[in-house]
Regions:
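Surface-exposed, charge/polar-rich loops and edge strands
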Residues: 1-342
Length: 342
């Protein structure tokens, strides 16, 4: 599979930089067995999906991952948070003291010493964040962030979490292909209506087409199930290899509840994954089940080509369907949720 085979012209006029209003009025192309295609709108989904369909959505929530800081020299610095260093996403966002994040930094070439900082004042009070370089690895910088918040009512320093700081001071991390600065409306527009678990630095894009009314209509005819995959900045990494199979996919953290595992164990239903992040999670679950069965130990990571190499042979030998694999996992999990990296 050569990179050049996937090259085509996409005019900028065809790239949406703001969502359709309402969201479910966006266009939808359907494909059925026999290569039959038809054109619809997302609002038509309830009539298109089978009545026994399980609709799987990714309930990750995009964090305000861009911080615009000032260097000691007065120059501007843009820090793009990628993922926490040596902490889980949940721990880092809940921290009230100090965190170290892996970051991409614009304007860092002349940031040779000192702390970058930013101060913001809103109805809640005064916020201040400082950033210090503590390391670098393969172009990714390790940035130590500290912050304070003074109450508008009392002037006292109050303990706030890192995610609260980001809500007050951060900017939404719009995709680079939009080529426009983030606006306050993006805090709503660049978020799915079912976003719940903070941790992504990019939205699970397919889900942006579903609005509250459509979700209500879908709930009447299908069962909706949530999984969590925190989308990383690697989703925008360009293909530079001649053979696309040599492209190294970035890892992403997922979490699936025990109830979701049980739903996947049900026989005789149709399943529809909303976008590639939901599909990646479901496919990974199957291969992790094969890995668990073969090794006897619960796995928490799936590497890029495991499914094609040793796990593929083992899956052929077992002959497991998705339902069989999830039935086995449901018994082995003992009612526990499953978090992993894929």
């Amino acid at each position: 599979m050569q990179n050049a085979e996937y090259a085509y012209e996409l005019p900028e006029s065809a790239i949406a930089v703001h969502p359709a209003m309402p969201r479910s009025s966006a266009r939808l192309l359907t494909w059925r067995d026999g290569a039959v295609t038809s054109h619809h709108r997302f609002k038509d989904l309830p009539a298109i999906l089978h009545a026994d369909t399980q609709l799987w959505v990714n309930n990750t929530r995009v964090i305000r991952a861009r911080l615009l800081l000032m260097k000691p020299t007065g120059g501007r610095l843009e820090v793009f948070l990628l993922e926490p260093h040596e902490r889980s996403m949940e721990q880092a966002l809940a921290s009230t003291q100090c965190v170290v994040w892996k970051c991409m930094v614009k304007g860092a070439k002349r940031w040779t010493a000192g702390e970058a900082a930013l101060q913001v004042e809103d109805s809640r009070g005064k916020w201040e964040v400082t950033a210090k370089r503590v390391g670098m690895d393969e172009g990714v910088r390790y940035i130590e962030l500290k912050w304070t918040h003074r109450s508008a009512a009392t002037g006292d320093v109050q303990e706030v979490s890192f995610v609260e700081l980001l809500e007050a001071m951060g900017k939404m991390p719009l995709p680079p292909y939009m080529r426009r600065p983030a606006e306050e409306q993006d805090a709503e527009d660049y978020q799915t209506v079912y976003a719940e678990v903070p941790g992504s630095v990019a939205a699970p894009t397919a889900g942006l087409h579903l609005d509250a009314q459509l979700m209500a209509n879908l709930s009447a005819s299908t069962s909706i199930h949530h999984i969590t995959l925190h989308v990383g900045a690697g989703t925008f990494k360009p293909l530079v290899e001649g053979d696309v199979r040599n492209h190294v996919m970035h890892g992403e953290n997922c979490s699936v509840s025990f109830d979701a595992i049980q739903a996947l164990a049900e026989d005789g239903v149709h399943r529809v994954a909303t976008g590639t992040t939901s599909l990646r999670t479901l496919e990974s679950l199957y291969w992790l089940a094969i890995k668990w069965k073969e090794t006897g130990e619960q796995p928490f990571e799936l590497n890029q080509w495991e499914w094609r190499n040793e796990l593929g042979t083992k899956a052929d030998r077992l002959g497991w369907s998705m339902e069989t694999a999830m039935q086995w996992c449901a018994n082995a999990l003992d009612r526990k949720d499953w978090s992993f990296r894929t």
